[in-house]
């Protein structure tokens, strides 16, 4: 008999999120130990396979065509180029290879090339993930046919705050794509960004949305905004570290089986803050020098920290 899924309320999550910090960490870490090896991390690598000139106006994004940033437009990479990057990622220790393209939605004519990329990366023994914008049911089915393991499509923030960050699409559009991905039988990677000007209440509503999905995301990336010059959020106030840890700990409690990925913003985090994030339940990171267009901690720096903490690669 299957276990009935709990439907969380705002008051439930407020009580978890806002409890004394030590109690929150204790509860999150106990759950983390129950469902995961607390001393192992999943390593993934993220590659931008088509960069810039995105028609969406996400206020945080360096790749939006609405803003003048440091990012230069680049066409879709060839299958050969992508596979070479995937080989290098595998040699660097990655187990999952994520491919991102700056589109509102992928053009149908690109689907055969994307399928070749998926098949080629899988042939190297890597898990595959893509983030290409919104997908139709048919497109999701094509990617599944090629063997795509995960599709990333973040909800970014709470439903209440969403239109303060993006105006070229609706929050419901995100949910529609997530439903198409799930219906195709592809695992879901879905999270958001802290530091968009949202309140704590927005973070709680964001977590509620994820946790109350019929099937919560298998992977939940938690990003700390990297402010980009030229975007509307270039001067956004950084979310303090304790708030980041509270968000990760609450996500771990609400979604105990999911991988919680500590993603963008690690370059600006101290070793101590990262250690707290891992203790709170984060058990996945991107390795490599770049996250799409922004810097990521260099491999040797990560290796040094993980050795200090006794964290090893997830088998």
From Swiss-Prot:
Gene3D superfamilies: Aldolase class I. GO terms for biological process: biotin biosynthetic process. CDD domains: Radical_SAM (cd01335). Pfam families: BATS, Radical_SAM. Its EC number is 2.8.1.6. Binds 1 [4Fe-4S] cluster. The cluster is coordinated with 3 cysteines and an exchangeable S-adenosyl-L-methionine. InterPro entries: Aldolase_TIM (IPR013785), BATS_dom (IPR010722), Biotin_synth/BioAB (IPR002684), Biotin_synthase (IPR024177), Elp3/MiaA/NifB-like_rSAM (IPR006638), rSAM (IPR007197). [4Fe-4S] cluster binds at residues 54, 58, 61. It catalyses: (4R,5S)-dethiobiotin + (sulfur carrier)-SH + 2 reduced [2Fe-2S]-[ferredoxin] + 2 S-adenosyl-L-methionine = (sulfur carrier)-H + biotin + 2 5'-deoxyadenosine + 2 L-methionine + 2 oxidized [2Fe-2S]-[ferredoxin]. Residues 39-266 form the Radical SAM core domain. GO terms for molecular function: 2 iron, 2 sulfur cluster binding; 4 iron, 4 sulfur cluster binding; biotin synthase activity; iron ion binding. Keywords: 2Fe-2S, 4Fe-4S, Biotin biosynthesis, Iron, Iron-sulfur, Metal-binding, S-adenosyl-L-methionine, Transferase. [2Fe-2S] cluster binds at residues 98, 129, 189, 261. Pathway: Cofactor biosynthesis; biotin biosynthesis; biotin from 7,8-diaminononanoate: step 2/2. Its cofactor is [4Fe-4S] cluster; [2Fe-2S] cluster. Homodimer. Catalyzes the conversion of dethiobiotin (DTB) to biotin by the insertion of a sulfur atom into dethiobiotin via a radical-based mechanism. NCBIfam families: bioB. Belongs to the radical SAM superfamily. Biotin synthase family. This is Biotin synthase. It comes from Legionella pneumophila (strain Lens). The gene is bioB.
